[in-house]
């Protein structure tokens, strides 16, 4: 039964209840359900039953609050809301309930087969240590998507200098992993935590396998087709020297196009986490963050950063205790006091202003003018056609007070597709209006997608790697943004948050001058 048929049955039930004088509220509920089912992006018949009842301990009333009041429609969105402390703002959702939901959802997601990079990164060291203990360190090499710093990992891959026949008995233990697949030259296991482990095996072409599996299928096929007679029994550097092209680091070995680029240009020194000089886009307990502004500023300074951009939610984000005009004035006064108190460091006044349905921002120009930085983001009515999304975003980009375009598509990896946009038109508009594009470093966002950053760099649009931190610990997410930026060949000169304090202030002043709002 498809969604249309399910919707038809709900609609019929609603009409029959009206005819028989049943409770009008119940009848209307079925009519509303019919509308929503018919407009679902995925077929309900394809949704596993366990997905509907995945979160134990949440009754119908809480589900109603989550869906109707919080406007949350997927497990991933709910997890993200918990991580941002949003559930605690609603009646019946305490800290314990919120943590229970996080634990249950993470367990569920771990069994779906795909993982975010940091989830795999957390367990990879133990797996590496285990394999090295079995086969010795010189015979084990990590490879594949994880080595390329992919944002989503389906399998953790290793090259092991041994044969299938010798490896399989070594995996027999009290809790052996499940052998899912065996092929000549590879074994695929499923670990107890649900993660799939692929081992590329064999001793004859061991060193070649280390290199060829480090790239995507497209990259490797193009490399092998173009460069024959390569001696793979050497380092990666030697392999590229033999091919007479510039060295390509593993994170860039995704497409054939990078090979053509490496023939003519030297790959620049890619941005590193240590290049980040300031925290841009952070939330305090004035909205939905966990820490005070002072706590966040002192922590940022202790970590070696030169400045902090506090970008609490705007007034339309009622679910996140968005700031009214009065609260903005009070916060700005408080920031002034902190800047006098904390020396050798600066806090910048900012806001994450909601892009409304018509593309306008949710404050008057006189209020927007009081901020050092305005991050414009979409948080509501995410189910848009490309035409609607483009109209909304382009108008926000054209607003002279927009400094940074936040999380461009609104996606949540493994949970929610972003709304459809024409990336090139968005980037062109940012270039024309002197708007910086955020690379939201939260590992569940990583938005703008790194695949579109190259075009932004061609158009001289600055990228800003921002943690979207709701806690002090959230500062650490910067690293995941850097890993994504490296895949787009971003240098520190092309990233706003790499600017030192003076350079950052100068950049903000220049942008405002170009926009005519200084």
What are the functions of these language-model segments?
Residues 118, 122-135, 142, 248-252, ...:
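Amphipathic alpha-helical
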Residues 107-118:
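Solvent-exposed, charged amphipathic helical/linker segments at domain boundaries
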Residues 149-163, 167-284, 290-304, 315-345, ...:
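Charged catalytic cores and adjacent phosphate/nucleic-acid-binding surfaces used
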Residues 125-166:
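Active-site nucleotide-donor binding segment shared across nucleotidyl transfer reactions
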Residues 350-353, 480:
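Active-site catalytic microenvironments in core metabolic enzymes, especially phosphate/sugar-handling
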Residues 1-84, 89-91, 100-107, 241, ...:
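Long, highly charged, low-complexity intrinsically disordered interaction regions
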